């Protein structure tokens, strides 16, 4: 039983030693100088907070051409008279200056930089290339002498050396051979002692007896950091400059207005932050290990993906090479065929010319024919020969090679192809799309339209994201609703909530991945469900003056010759013609909304709603040409009715004329404005691109809105004792276009070869 416990204890001890050894090896990376790749020796803290050995820093500055700027840092005493080993016992350490001495020093000009002459206008700025961050850091005029030694890092390096060294005992430096193992060290004397030597060299009753013993070490450091400018102990920390300062630095003009705190406060704050961060890291070791596993998996995936990408690129380039090789063979074949054809023609021409030589070919045959004495036989043979001789003579007189020897027509212009091959590069993700705000709107549904910027890589499909902004925010990241793999450059979002604000964005995707999101666009949905209706011209509309479109969603008033002839027969001073068009749907409950666009060039148009029965009574029997004594309107927006009548009017119209909305004086009595920022009664406001009408049947109210921004223009009471329908009145020329519901738009088709294809 005891042997088992001993074995378990031994195993636990060995595991602990292995863990300590592993942690020490891992920590060793933090203790290596980035220049010499060895343990730090007298490390200096650069302005970029990285560390470098003092000797390495001097060497780097020497390579950069800075000579004489590699002085020792202030924390290491350099004067032989002031070094701890040679300092007189009668001399005590310098104490902090008193406030009155500080004033005298400042008045005498002590605040100038050491080593810098007064009046120097262009001091040399020393730049040091940091080997850790690969950046140039400014050391100031004093070079390395203006840097602090990292004493904490030195102590960590020393503890690390002692922990990993086995049998490396530190020997006494003052013993006679053989020296004993050192048990104490003295920072002032900069030496290690055994017990006997320490007592011998620190006799009782002398100044050296006051030296504080330390653990034995091979590298001695000063007890504290000293100001590089004033050789005083640092007592404060400048948060603005992020630098330790002494009492003299604190009152200098350089730190005027800076946030300066005592070293104790900075020490406690930084220690608390570091402890808190370290505690968090140590408490989440499982998370760290999980993330390490994820990173290792990412490394493996990167290796596999990189190899696949290499193979794909190689395959594509080989494909390009195969196409080029095939094209090369085809072009060479064409040149070869052209060359053989020309050679054949030139060879035939050479043979013809050789036959013209004396005694050979055609000439020899002709000479023999001329020897014939039989006239009929000569004529028979010479007839055909003469034709050949004539052609040969003509060819001789107009000599020209039968084929050109030049192949200029076979030259290739590969400038465009070379440019394409030079610009051949990896596919980039699409750039952020640009939302077309002129074509994007919200009506019965939300229609979103966008386009890619010029010179953007193509997108195979898009992702549309949207969410409501007027709902309480849920804890955690913002949740978006997505529409994946949208083809084309537009999207339709069905059944949006009424009276809400939606924010939408879109991004493209191709084989390279997803691109950046577009800028967010905010859309207001209508305050009520959209009412679908058409224009009804069966009554109250003059076919001579009103033209209704085939789809019954647009109407135009065109005053013509009948109006002029009718006006000429009347003796009144002013003649007006009122034409009315109603919607074919009446509202009997709930809330409804619709929108329309009024032509800005319209003379006078009234857009609104009214009781269907009252509209028929008022307008169906009205004469075509009327005088001012006959008013077809209810008078609610002209102020003609008695203001004391509390009954709601049967009509509610918004008057538009010549690109302006006319808010009559009577509007203030019968119509309530929708807000304190709304228009004032008795004025005009610009006509928006679209007008919206919202009818609340139960409340008996109708609101007129800017259908683009949904800003309220006017709110009026309305008698809703019966069916209420939309109405449009025209006086003079004008036009109205109903906004077509998005859901009823037919899909645009493109006919190709007798087949209909959806666009």
Curated annotation (Swiss-Prot):
The modification Phosphoserine is found at residues 330, 627. Gene3D superfamilies: 1.20.5.170, 2.60.120.920, 4.10.830.40, Classic Zinc Finger (3.30.160.60), Immunoglobulins (2.60.40.10), Zinc/RING finger domain, C3HC4 (zinc finger) (3.30.40.10). A zinc finger (RING-type) spans 33-59, 172-231. GO terms for biological process: anterograde synaptic vesicle transport; axonogenesis; microtubule bundle formation; negative regulation of axon extension; neuron migration; positive regulation of anterograde dense core granule transport; protein localization to axon; regulation of protein localization. GO terms for molecular function: zinc ion binding. Residues 73-89 have a biased composition (Low complexity). Residues 411-429 are annotated as: Required for microtubule association, proximal axon localization and axon formation. The keyword Nucleotide-binding does not apply. Residues 67-98, 623-643 are annotated as: Disordered. Residues 370-427 form the COS domain. InterPro entries: B30.2/SPRY, B30.2/SPRY_sf, ConA-like_dom_sf, COS_domain, E3_ligase_FN3/SPRY, FN3_dom, FN3_sf, Ig-like_fold. Residues 526-747 form the B30.2/SPRY domain. Zn(2+) binds at residues 227, 230, 249, 255. CDD domains: Bbox1_TRIM46_C-I, Bbox2_TRIM46_C-I, FN3, RING-HC_TRIM46_C-I, SPRY_PRY_TRIM46. A zinc finger (B box-type) spans 222-263. It comes from the Eukaryota. It holds the Pfam family COS. PANTHER family: E3 UBIQUITIN-PROTEIN LIGASE TRIM36-RELATED, TRIPARTITE MOTIF-CONTAINING PROTEIN 46. Belongs to the TRIM/RBCC family. This is Tripartite motif-containing protein 46. The gene is TRIM46.
